[in-house]
Amino acid sequence: MYYVTPRQLVFPGDVIATADSKVEGPVYLDNGKYRSLVVGLVEFREDVVVVVPLEGTYKPKKGDLVIGYVTDVLATGWEVDVRSFMPAYLPVGEALHRHVDLETTPLTTFLNIGDVVVAKVKDVDLTDEYPIILTLKDEKVGKVESGTVVEITPVKVPRVIGKRGSMLNTLMELGCDIVVGQNGRIWVKCKDPRDEVFLASLIRKIEAESHVMGLTDRIRAEIENYKTSKQQGTV
């Protein structure tokens, strides 16, 4: 028995069909019913119902490094946009390293709407009110004070990193700090603002040409040309 129709938009947790049905795609079995794991569209292929993930939606996993924007200040933490199917939740206890009296200290003292954070995904539980829990209690995480955030399609993140980190190491030849979030947000911080603009353009080029052979060498050549132009004062 099916609970969906062709081209229907489904969200994580939505019931797709009963266990005796043929279902494919990112789904899970719960009490005799298939439920969707992702935001996707339903397709019927002969006698099989298929959930097709919508490209660009980040699918969080425990341990992922993500870059998010604070979208709301709650009573005991913050709501954070991580480009997923639902906002993530950053509890006070996972953000601060000391006790805070919430009755006398407003949370906006630490993080406010619009702030950018680099965080780790601590847990993912689709049965919770906030399925995605974040933490700042890890290395290389915390509030981002400056720099540039570039957004790409999450599925292109491995290309920006490259095999054994080859592409990322190439990008870092400019001497900038770069943090790649698994949710498709990339933070870049350089001493020279022009370098940030240049790196942002390279990252978008990698996204657009991820299928091209020899892309790492081409990006390295562009960086060398850029360095030469800076030395000559033509940038």
Curated annotation (Swiss-Prot):
PROSITE patterns: S1. GO terms for biological process: CUT catabolic process; exonucleolytic trimming to generate mature 3'-end of 5.8S rRNA from tricistronic rRNA transcript (SSU-rRNA, 5.8S rRNA, LSU-rRNA); poly(A)-dependent snoRNA 3'-end processing; RNA catabolic process; U4 snRNA 3'-end processing. It comes from the Archaea. GO terms for cellular component: cytoplasm; exosome (RNase complex). Keywords: Cytoplasm, Exosome, RNA-binding. Residues 63-137 form the S1 motif domain. It is found in: Cytoplasm. The keyword RNA-binding applies. SUPFAM superfamilies: Eukaryotic type KH-domain (KH-domain type I), Nucleic acid-binding proteins, Ribosomal L27 protein-like. GO terms for molecular function: poly(A) binding; RNA binding. Non-catalytic component of the exosome, which is a complex involved in RNA degradation. Increases the RNA binding and the efficiency of RNA degradation. Confers strong poly(A) specificity to the exosome. NCBIfam families: PRK04163.1-1 (NF003181). Component of the archaeal exosome complex. Forms a trimer of Rrp4 and/or Csl4 subunits. The trimer associates with a hexameric ring-like arrangement composed of 3 Rrp41-Rrp42 heterodimers. Belongs to the RRP4 family. This is Exosome complex component Rrp4. It comes from Pyrobaculum aerophilum (strain ATCC 51768 / DSM 7523 / JCM 9630 / CIP 104966 / NBRC 100827 / IM2).
